[in-house]
Amino acid sequence: MTARDARGGFRVAVTGIGVKSPAGNTPEEAYQTFLAAESTAAPVDRLAAEAVPVRFACLVPPFEPEAYLTRREARQIDRVTMLALCAAADAVADARPPGDLAPERTGVQLGTGIGGLPSMEATARDHGDSPMGMPVHTVPRTMANSPACRIAMRFGFRGSCTTYATACASGTTALGEAARKIRYGELDMALAGGADAPVTTVIMSGFARMRALSLRNEEPRLASRPFDAGRDGFVVGEGAAMLMLERWDLAVARGATVHGEITGYADNCDAFHIVAPHEDGSVAAACMRSALADAGLSPSDVGHVNAHGTSTLLNDHAEAAAIGRCFGGQSPPVTALKGVTGHLIGGSGALEAALALRCASVGLVPAIANTVSSPEADLVDLVTGSPRAVRSAPVLSNSFGFGGQNACLVLAPPP
């Protein structure tokens, strides 16, 4: 197998995956939950104000952070950094990097849409009347770059350490930019992905005030329903996913297990509205086409599409229109994972990329949870009802965020 892609850059292998998500705390657990199309939405009791109209979310199931963190780390970090660090540790363990790894050639690229805002919210609540009594680690906890920097500190990675804030596209942006750095020789390896922990009173209230959230408090497991005719808003989730990316030739030379490859990436901006997508999907479609071109592929080469699919009226319709434009009305099978996990904000794109790669490798795509009938069914081939067998082929994974941020990845299963 050649070490270079069609453009002469280094190929980018995925050699490690770690997840902490509502669907499960390992890639296999998450994949099985997605295959079952089981929603993880449930009532939550961590919201301080009774006036918050939405009382449910998708939370990471219990695990043992103390197995990953020192007591000092646990005292100094907040939840988003904890989830990111634990997912990163699993990805490193999966990748088993060489002992002679060059730290200056290994980086961390991480996306987050909310960052440390939950810590600032808690500090304002608990210490608003006595600000000098706030924890000494308040500022480091609230910095958006804390998760990436803590990961770099933990593993001694001294290469590029960058945090991306492209709203709900943040995790996908981080993966794509990490792949570019490896492709063009800036890094040999990178831990890349996304994380967010947005299930808090202020954040949930803010989304609810925008009328962006589902109000199905009496039936939360039916609330997230991407592309379904009865969708009424998204469900907030939390979580992190980190992937170890590596120069293909170096991974093969050391006998690493290769889970797949990032072959294409593109990003652009609608430049249309601060929270709404352009309804005709033209700019998002251009982003998809650019990602395919970056991978040296045509639309017919794609085995399936992992849609952003938030379960909102505007986003799902605009994305369906964009997919229709990109594929010229010949849509491959389209799935969307947020029916299971809700929306992890900056963590969603990274988790979905990891699971999309698994689906492409296995050749079995999950049905979209809770989706029965769709007004977009004439635009795209939605996978509903039961999992669908697909050919082993590259997958296009989409992420779109507030501000008109679009990011698309093309991932290929291992040869």
Name each region found by the language model.
Residues G24-N25, S119-A122, T200-G206, F272-V275, ...:
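Short acidic, glycine/serine/threonine-rich loops at helix termini
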Residues F272-G281, T310-F327, L344-L351:
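Short glycine/threonine-rich loop-to-helix capping motif typified by GTGT followed
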Residues M1-G9, A95-G111, A124-V136, M153-C161, ...:
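Structural signature of cysteine-dependent C-C bond-forming condensing enzymes
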Residues M1-E73, D249-E261, A354-I368, A407, ...:
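ACP-dependent fatty acid/polyketide chain-elongation machinery
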Residues G18-K20, T112-G115, T166-S170, G194-V199, ...:
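Acidic, glycine-rich active-site loops and adjacent beta-strand->loop/helix elements
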Residues F10-T15, S39-P43, E218-A295, G303-H304:
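Condensing-enzyme catalytic core mediating Claisen C-C bond formation in acyl metabolism
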Residues T2-G9, P43-C86, G115-E177, E186, ...:
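Conserved catalytic cysteine-centered active-site region
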